[in-house]
A protein has these predicted regions:
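Short catalytic/ligand-binding loop motif for oxyanion handling, primarily in non-cytosolic enzymes
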Residues: 11-14, 154-156
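AMP-dependent adenylate-forming
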Residues: 2-4, 19-193
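Adenylate-forming
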Residues: 3-11
């Protein structure tokens, strides 16, 4: 049996798990799964509202018995990450804001979506470049890839090493991603550092 575990150090190890099913296709990624019984794991949007609908990305937050007391002699980081639960105004209850982004899939399993501090804002949407790269990398014929945001020109650029034609790659990405997440420029390159 293989199990995918997720958990930052601040939770003193793991807070979610997913038992891999050998019959399932994990081409789109392996979920981080469901919380352990002693943890409550949930997603918050930018307005501190709980996210429950599938495919909506939010910050992964944790509360429970394994939550650390905080960072040693680092009050700034404590104030940013070990905070009062915004969903509970009735009594003191600390949560840990991981800075990780996640979403629920259609089966209700958590799926890691990247880091909050690598987000950009483009066409009115918050975008995780890693998410675009993950979808691009899953397309047949793509060996390596990266996505960059050109702030000066305000556009997304995708670079890839592989055998797939640009038009085929663009069409495949349009089937997997919303229009605002499709790089305006796709460039095939020989090598990538």
């Amino acid at each position: 049996m293989f199990v995918n575990l997720y958990g930052p150090t601040e939770i003193t190890c793991n807070c979610t798990y997913h038992i891999l099913n050998p019959e399932r296709d994990y081409a789109a990624g392996i979920p981080i799964g469901i919380p352990f019984p002693n943890e409550d794991v949930f997603l918050l949007d930018g307005e501190n509202r709980k996210i429950t609908e599938p495919e909506t990305v939010g910050e992964l937050c944790v509360r429970g018995t394994a939550l650390a007391l905080g960072y040693y002699r680092n009050p700034e980081q404590n104030a940013a990450h070990f905070v009062q639960n915004p969903l509970n105004p009735n009594y003191p209850e600390r949560i840990y804001r991981t800075g990780d982004l996640a979403r629920y899939d259609e089966a209700g399993l958590l799926v890691f979506s990247g880091r909050k501090d690598f987000q950009i804002k483009y066409m009115g949407h918050r975008i995780e470049l890693e998410e675009i790269e993950r979808e691009m990398a899953a397309i047949d014929g793509v060996e390596r890839c990266c996505c960059l945001f050109d702030e000066k020109r305000s556009r997304l650029k995708g670079f890839y090493v592989g055998t797939v034609e640009k038009e085929t790659l663009h069409a495949a990405m349009r089937r997997k991603l919303p229009e605002y997440m499709i790089p305006g420029i796709l460039r095939q390159v020989e090598t990538m550092p």
